[in-house]
Design a protein with these regions (language model features):
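N-terminal phosphate/diphosphate-binding loop that engages ATP/GTP or pyrophosphate donors
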Residues: 1-41
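Histidine-anchored nucleotide/phosphate-binding helix
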Residues: 75-79, 97-107
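Short glycine/serine/threonine-rich phosphate/pyrophosphate-binding segments
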Residues: 66-69, 95-98
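C-terminal lobe/tail of nucleotide-utilizing enzymes
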Residues: 104-166
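Phosphate-binding/switch loop-helix module in NTP-utilizing enzymes
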Residues: 31-68, 75-79
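Inter-motif core of Ras-like GTPase G domains
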Residues: 69-92
Length: 166
């Protein structure tokens, strides 16, 4: 939410990337159901259309249980528009719990999980436990900047192709 959009950052790093317009754009830095209310926007979660594209990366606002409107969360929307998922997480106290809950929620809805991308400085202990417990393959995305973005993006692409068998 807000004017500092991830898509603006990515576009500034990689000019050749196609960024689709948001299905809904909220300015309020809050959960979408709160932003919707504060901005007096009227939309229903299931009316948000996905763009037609051969390759499409969809970034949701927040986690799987982030409310999208007053009745539905991101997981409901993903369940309606089932696409293979890549789960993104970072290393922090409590991340194992959040990751495993997300993996279980995706399994329960029969949403294919291609890989878990862990962002930040690698923590082998966390990776080992998550992999042993869930069986989900893990790839890493180190922090990047404008100078090393293309190198990091290509490394992530290579690793995802290797584990997810695109």
């Amino acid at each position: 939410a807000g004017e500092n959009k991830d898509s603006n950052l990515i576009t500034s790093f990689a000019k050749d990337v196609k960024i689709h317009k948001e299905g809904v754009f909220l300015k309020t830095p809050a959960s979408p159901h709160i932003g919707k209310k504060l901005e007096r926007l009227d939309y229903k979660a299931f009316d948000i259309a996905l763009p037609e594209s051969k390759n499409l990366l969809i970034e949701t606002a927040g986690g799987l249980f982030t409310p999208l409107d007053d009745k539905h969360c991101m997981l409901d929307y993903i369940s309606l528009n089932i696409k293979p998922c890549i789960l993104l997480a970072s290393y922090y106290l409590g991340c194992i719990n959040h990751i495993l809950l997300s993996i279980e929620a995706l399994k329960q809805r029969q949403i294919p999980l291609l890989a878990l991308v862990m962002s930040g400085k690698k923590d082998e202990d966390i990776d080992d436990f998550v992999f042993k417990y869930s069986g989900v393959k893990i790839v890493h995305l180190e922090h990047f900047n404008k100078e090393n973005f293309r190198q990091k993006a290509l490394a992530l692409r290579r690793d995802l192709i290797n584990v997810a068998k695109f």
